[in-house]
Amino acid sequence: MINFDNLYRYQDSLGYIAMQLCFPEKKTFNENIFNEVIDPSHPGYQDLLAFREQMMQYTLSEIQQIYTDTFDFSKKAPLYMTYNQFDTQKERGQMLAKLKVLYEMFGLKMVDNELSDYLSLMLQFLQTIEWRGDERAEENIQLVIMIIEDGTYVMANELGKLNHPYGYVIQALRKTLKLCLQVPEGVALHD
């Protein structure tokens, strides 16, 4: 089940995290945006702060190289959440189609060349979705969050082992999304 109060509370921060997981630009590390969106009570505050502190040691071109090496050339940290989740391309294709329809159902128009399981796109969807009064919201938002949960689990562990800067962003995301779910008793989410 979705904790809609927390989802509403953290929507803007999901957009901020999405920005951190896109190819880095100068505004990616804008301190004013960070301070405006992420306050000390945010569940991922310490992780995002650690990420910023590590990245501030590098130039923008070095950060872009770190990003490319991490996400474009490694199968252990794909930004496509279903990349390692399905046994066949057919199964993955069906999920991609389902996500695309889901986004359109809630008014998000995708760019033609983007896959619907791209993490930043999924977070932008959660940031902008208007669910109030829509009976389809709970099931569909839960699907998106669970795909992100599954897709980031291995990535969080791999990047965490390396003390990789982007590991902090993934941990902040997972902590935030965990609070957006109301987990039934007896069921546990991965940390």
Indicate where each model-derived feature is located.
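Charged, alpha-helix-forming regions
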Residues: 1-191
